[in-house]
Design a protein with these regions (language model features):
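Conserved interdomain hinge at the start of the Helicase C-terminal
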Residues: 324-358
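Conserved helicase motor "Helicase C" RecA-like lobe of SF1/SF2 P-loop NTPases
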Residues: 357-378
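A substrate-engagement module of RecA-like helicase motors
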Residues: 3-10, 62-156, 245-248, 252, ...
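Signature of the SF2 helicase/ATPase Hel1-core->accessory helical subdomain module
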Residues: 72-75, 79, 140-157, 161-241, ...
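Conserved RecA-like P-loop NTPase helicase motor core
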Residues: 327-335, 380-471
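A contiguous, basic/glycine-rich beta-loop/short-helix subdomain that forms a polymer-engagement track
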Residues: 132-155, 166-169, 236-320, 372-380, ...
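Walker A/P-loop
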Residues: 34-54
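Conserved pre-motif I regulatory segment
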Residues: 2-41
């Protein structure tokens, strides 16, 4: 791959490459041409998106998929692709594009797979529709399925979330914010929805054995203030198979009734943990494409991904991080007194700064601290001031720019123990070394650094960081890759 070829792509787009960007793009293009699985790590603001797009174009690896955790950033990627003369399409999932999504809720995915022959919209357009994103498809779709019509849209780059099906031939696949692949896929349901599912099951042709098992499971869930949901104590294989059969039959005959059962199906096949709501976790999945480009600003110290080559651009500037060891959110040590200590440190630190992000590890901690936040779990106004609080791994933890001068990580954001155990089994099946430690450490470190990344939008002006939990002391060596540490 010649540097002139890469340089010409930048010149035609009237883009002035940053220091090192041409060389990195050239190397990426070489790896893509040779079919490698690549980790590309560079700081926020370095220009990763343009570099990867230019490398795809230089390598002739088009059409390609670009996978994102949330479609919020899809428009920006499409705009960058357009600057390089590439036509991108931002594809929505069924929940955004299916005409039956509002009626069937999250059971729409299973309905589409099992009962598509019953769908009144299951037709394709006579000609490929021309559109830039799923919103335009919705406006165009008359008498055909908007979701499947997206597979016909002419484009060189398809931008979609990690979980949407991929049926088009592609010469490469890019995974944006690939650090998310160390985390299990999480779904949240309310206890009320689970109770509705149990009620719906009683009015279905279910055996007394299954109904009894579900009622015992529901009593178990209601009795837990916080902790793992021990589904396997109540659900044997016969229960699970019968539930799946009833659910599939209802999808065909009475899909709206099937919708009510979906929370039970999710709970039966996932690993769950209760806080205020039920969090259901499933194993992460790595796309099986080759070439594959994994893009991230925050790679964990050990990346449990099947990577063959790495390109890492070091951070020119690191945030200063203060370690506070007099507090912790560890389950056995957290108390009302500890919550008061966290309130004190938030007030003491936040009064020195215009904007403060507070990242909390769980709903349990959020309940005690959110009254002290100006904004909680909501995108703030553009000119916001005060304290914005969100849970690690929540919607606000990814994809939004929440520029702030101070970030307080109020507790180590570990996964629940039973979820870490499930993740360890998955890592063990992949032959990764020390899977139990990896399943505990990697998601916690990624969630910590991601929380800080939400506030750090200017590479030359990092926020001050407060790591408020004595357990961060265990990770000094790993944290030095991201922060200049200072003990307080």
């Amino acid at each position: 791959m010649s540097e002139e070829r890469v340089r010409k792509i930048f010149e035609e787009a009237e883009l002035a490459p940053r220091v090192g960007q041409l060389e990195v793009t050239e190397k990426l293009a070489e790896f893509i041409e040779s079919g490698k699985r690549i980790l590309f790590a560079a700081p926020t603001g370095w220009g990763k998106t343009i570099a990867v797009l230019a490398a795809l174009k230089a390598a002739g690896a088009i059409p390609a998929y670009w996978l994102v955790r949330a479609l919020d950033i899809g428009e920006r990627i499409a705009e960058d692709a357009a600057r390089l003369g590439m036509f991108a399409y931002v594809a929505g999932g069924r929940e955004k594009t299916c005409p039956l999504a509002e009626q069937l809720g999250d059971s729409i995915h299973d309905f589409c797979k099992i009962a598509r022959h019953k769908c009144p919209h299951a037709r394709l357009p006579p000609e490929p529709p021309v559109a830039k994103d799923w919103r335009e498809i919705l406006k165009l779709a008359k008498g055909y399925c908007p979701y499947y019509a997206q597979d016909m849209v002419p484009s060189e780059l398809v931008i979609q979330n990690y979980h949407r099906r991929r049926v088009r031939p592609a010469r490469a696949c890019v995974v944006d914010e690939a650090h998310n692949l160390v985390e299990p896929h999480e779904k949240v349901i309310t206890i009320a929805r689970l109770a509705e599912a149990a009620s719906a099951l009683r009015h279905s042709p279910a055996s007394s054995h299954l109904v009894s098992a579900v009622e015992k499971l529901l009593r178990h869930v209601v009795s837990i203030a916080e902790g793992p949901v021990l589904t396997s104590l109540y659900f044997d294989e016969d229960c699970y198979n019968e539930l799946r059969r009833i659910y599939a039959e209802l999808l065909i005959e009475e899909p709206e009734r099937a919708r009510a059962l979906r929370p039970l199906v999710d709970l039966a096949q996932g690993t769950a943990y209760i806080e205020e709501e039920i969090h259901i976790f499933k194993e992460p999945q790595l796309p099986r494409y080759r070439p594959l480009v994994l893009v991230t600003a925050t790679p964990p110290p050990v990346l449990p991904l099947e990577v063959e080559v790495e390109l890492r651009i070091p951070q020119a500037v690191k945030p200063k991080a203060v370690l506070l060891s007099h507090v912790t959110t560890a389950f056995s040590q957290y108390s009302k007194r500890m919550a008061t200590e966290y309130k004190k440190l938030i007030l003491d630190w936040a009064k020195r700064y215009k904007r403060t992000l507070v990242v909390v590890p769980s709903e349990r901690v959020a309940r005690d601290l959110r009254a002290w936040a100006t904004h909680y779990e909501t995108a703030p106004p553009k000119d916001w001031e005060g304290v914005l609080m969100f849970r690690a791994r929540s919607r606000l933890s990814e994809g939004l720019d929440l520029k702030a001068e101070l970030v307080i990580v109020a507790g180590c954001p570990y996964l629940p123990p039973n979820v870490s155990e499930q993740l360890a089994r998955y890592y063990r099946s992949k032959g990764l070394p020390d899977p139990a430690k990896l399943a505990i450490d990697a998601p916690m470190l990624v969630a910590t650094v991601q929380g800080v990344g939400r506030a750090w939008r200017d590479p030359s002006a990092p926020p001050t960081v407060v790591l408020a939990d004595w357990r961060f002391e265990r990770y000094k060596e790993e944290l030095k890759a991201y922060f200049d540490l200072e003990e307080h």
